[in-house]
C-alpha cells in the first residue's frame, strides 16, 4: 500500500476512535465512560496491529496493511464500541436504580449481568468468522483473521479495560469533587 493511502487509513482509524469517544460522551454525558471507551477501543486496535506486526511474514497468508485490514479494523472498532455501550448502559441503569449504592458493587453487578450476553455474542461471532477463515478462501483470510483477533481483544478490553478505567476515573472525579466541596 502506498504511503499516501497508509496515511489516509491511519487518519481514518484515528478519527473513528476519536468520534467513538465523542459519541460515548454525548450518549452517556459522562467523561469517565468516554475515557474508558476510548481506552478500550484504542487498546483493541493497537493489540490487533501488534499481532499483525509480530506475525507478518510468519503466517501462511498475506498480512499486509491494505484496504481489507483497514476495513476489518473499522468493523472491529464498531463492534467493540457496541459491546462497551451495552455494558455502560447497564451500569448507568443500575446507578439510576440505586443512586446511593456502593459504586463498586453496582459496577461489578452490572458487569456480571452483561457477562453472559457479552461472551455468547463474542463466541457466536468468533465461530462464524472462524468458519469463514477456514473455508472462505485465501483472499478472505487476512480480513477474517483481523476480525477474529478483534472479537477476542474487543471482548477482553470491554470487560477488563473499559469498565475498570471508567470506574476509576469516576471514582477520582467524585473524590476530587468531595474534596473541593469540603473546602
For each predicted feature, which ranges?
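Short helix-capping/hinge motifs at transmembrane helix termini and TM-loop junctions
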Residues: 27-28, 55-60, 135-137, 170
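Alpha-helical transmembrane segments of multi-pass membrane proteins
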Residues: 16, 20, 74-82, 150-154
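Hydrophobic transmembrane alpha-helices and their membrane-interface caps
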Residues: 34-92
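Internal alpha-helical transmembrane segments of multipass membrane proteins
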Residues: 6-47, 51, 122-133
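Short helix-terminus and kink motifs of transmembrane alpha helices
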Residues: 32-36, 83-89, 93, 138-141, ...
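Hydrophobic alpha-helical transmembrane segments of membrane transport and translocation systems
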Residues: 108, 135-183
Amino acid at each position: 500500500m502506498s504511503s499516501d493511502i497508509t496515511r489516509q487509513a491511519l487518519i481514518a482509524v484515528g478519527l473513528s476512535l476519536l468520534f467513538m469517544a465523542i459519541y460515548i460522551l454525548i450518549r452517556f454525558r459522562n467523561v469517565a465512560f468516554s475515557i474508558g471507551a476510548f481506552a478500550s477501543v484504542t487498546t483493541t486496535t493497537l493489540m490487533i496491529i501488534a499481532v499483525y506486526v509480530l506475525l507478518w511474514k510468519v503466517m501462511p497468508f498475506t498480512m499486509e496493511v491494505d484496504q481489507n485490514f483497514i476495513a476489518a479494523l473499522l468493523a472491529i472498532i464498531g463492534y467493540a464500541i457496541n459491546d462497551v455501550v451495552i455494558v455502560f448502559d447497564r451500569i448507568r441503569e443500575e446507578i439510576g436504580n440505586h443512586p446511593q449504592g456502593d459504586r463498586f458493587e453496582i459496577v461489578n453487578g452490572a458487569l456480571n449481568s452483561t457477562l453472559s450476553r457479552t461472551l455468547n455474542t463474542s463466541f457466536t461471532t468468533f465461530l462464524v468468522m472462524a468458519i469463514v477463515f477456514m473455508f472462505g478462501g485465501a483472499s478472505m483470510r487476512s480480513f477474517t483473521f483481523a476480525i477474529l483477533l478483534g472479537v477476542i481483544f474487543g471482548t477482553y478490553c470491554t470487560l477488563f479495560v473499559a469498565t475498570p478505567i471508567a470506574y476509576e476515573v469516576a471514582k477520582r472525579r467524585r473524590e476530587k469533587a468531595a474534596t473541593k466541596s469540603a473546602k
